[in-house]
Curated annotation (Swiss-Prot):
This is Dihydroorotase. Keywords: Hydrolase, Metal-binding, Pyrimidine biosynthesis, Zinc. GO terms for cellular component: cytoplasm. Pathway: Pyrimidine metabolism; UMP biosynthesis via de novo pathway; (S)-dihydroorotate from bicarbonate: step 3/3. GO terms for biological process: 'de novo' UMP biosynthetic process; purine nucleobase catabolic process. The gene is pyrC.
């Protein structure tokens, strides 16, 4: 099958390309990128006024499958991904059973191949059962198809176990994704510690719970010379630690999520459980630090931490509500808001959704280089729309952005040369 995309603004940050080019896809690969491409028997897509970029990649997604399919499954989650412009996602291992073994990894890959909406890269567990006690079989999981390991949802609290995990993972060149959190400091907190928490009568989570854990994990990564990717950064202190570590040459990358550069703890006012996540929404100063970190490359990845929940798990009092929000269909327009507000260049914004995540986990996408897999996202940056949570592709509806007026949207998603989403579909 051939697809010829014409008249679009081709933006490939990995190769410094920002030109009005055509893109020819043939035999599931990028066959040609250039001007006035001529070919017969190709499906033509006129991308006038649109951006043509490498397929977006989200390296922090909870697909809830196996075990929690009432919230999301691989089919619905990848459908939501495609609708958001993502051609690939990396799924977290906190499922039931936990993805701490070869068999569960193979199950995920098999089901993802059947769904076909987006590529799925499994992330295995660092420790067996996510219990933080003994290391999982990292080598077996990598051989089965895992691209990284994490105990996401739980920190690896024991420093020696984290050290051994980094050393073991280094032998396979496998990135460790760190959920950096000191549970002894978190206690029974449910939102950011500060004035708003006091005003609402809710127990707070201090910023130092994240920052101290990031500091430990970064130092362990330097000590072991292992690859570390810091997940869902939400605080100024964490940004500063990561910036300094990268300047020293540490093998550290880091991500943040759209809610951390869009919302602050003020969103919790009214006890809105859709504004409850872990780590919690922070202060306006933290938000500015996150934006600065994206602009200077300290944070090279924007990932959603897409965390679907059933309404019964959110429509309860704030203290009892589960943490997390969905984000696959809102990440792109929220990122484009940063561009419109002058906080991030368009090229850097697209890089944080493409080449940045690909580099962090050594994934094959993130570029429109000739010969590479034909994973392409076409974006209309000017389209205006209002988010209706009930109209989303995810099985869950837990978003704090309901009824927000957004600008910019994926209008076509192409995975391995197959169109998996059109806005008109």
């Amino acid at each position: 099958m051939k697809i010829l995309i014409t008249n679009g603004r081709v933006l490939d940050p990995a190769h410094g390309i920002d030109e009005k080019f055509d893109v020819l896809i043939e035999d599931n690969r990028i066959a040609q990128v250039g001007t006035d491409i001529q070919t017969a028997d190709a499906e033509k897509i006129d991308a006038a006024g649109c951006l043509v970029v490498p397929g977006l990649i989200d390296i922090h997604v909870h697909l809830r499958d196996p075990g929690f399919e009432y919230k999301e499954d691989i089919e619905s989650g990848t459908r939501a991904a495609a609708a958001g412009g993502f051609t690939a996602v990396a799924c977290m291992p906190n499922t039931s059973p936990v993805n701490d073994n070869k068999a569960t990894t193979q199950y995920i890959l098999h089901k993802a191949a059947q769904a076909g909406h987006a590529k799925v890269y499994p992330v295995g567990a660092i420790t067996k059962g996510l219990k933080g006690e003994s290391l999982a079989e990292l080598g077996d999981m990598k051989q089965a198809g895992c691209v990284a390991v994490t105990d996401d949802g739980h920190p690896v609290s024991h420093g020696e176990i984290m050290r051994r995990a980094l050393e073991y993972a280094r032998s396979f060149d496998l990135p460790i994704v760190s959920h950096s959190e000191d549970l002894s400091l978190v206690g029974d907190g449910v939102m950011n510690d500060g004035f708003v928490a006091t005003e609402l009568g809710l127990r707070g989570i201090p910023w130092v719970a994240e920052v101290s854990a990031v500091a430990r994990d970064v130092m362990l990564a330097e000590y072991t010379n292992a690859r570390l990717h810091v997940a869902h950064v939400s605080t100024r202190g964490a940004v500063e630690i990561i910036r300094a570590a990268k300047a020293r040459g540490a093998r550290v990358t880091a991500e943040t999520a759209p809610h951390y550069f869009t919302l602050t703890e003020d969103a919790v006012r009214g006890y809105d459980t859709h504004a409850k996540m872990n780590p919690p929404l922070r202060t306006s100063d933290d938000l500015e630090a996150i934006r600065e970190g994206l602009a200077d490359g300290t944070l090279s990845v924007i990932a959603t931490d897409h965390a679907p929940h059933h309404p019964d798990e959110k429509n309860v009092e704030f203290n009892l509500a589960l943490n997390g929000i969905i984000g696959l269909e809102t990440a792109l327009p929220l990122t484009l808001r940063l561009v419109e507000e002058g906080a991030l260049s368009l090229s850097d914004a697209i890089a944080c959704l493409t080449s940045g995540p690909a580099a962090a986990l050594s994934l094959p996408g993130g570029t429109l280089e000739v010969g590479r897999p034909a994973d392409v996202t076409i974006i209309d940056p000017e389209i205006k729309w209002t988010l209706d949570p009930q109209a989303g592709q995810s099985r869950s509806r837990n978003t704090p952005f309901g009824d927000w007026k957004l600008k910019g949207r994926a209008i076509c998603t192409i995975v391995d040369g197959r169109i998996t989403y059109r806005l008109s579909d």
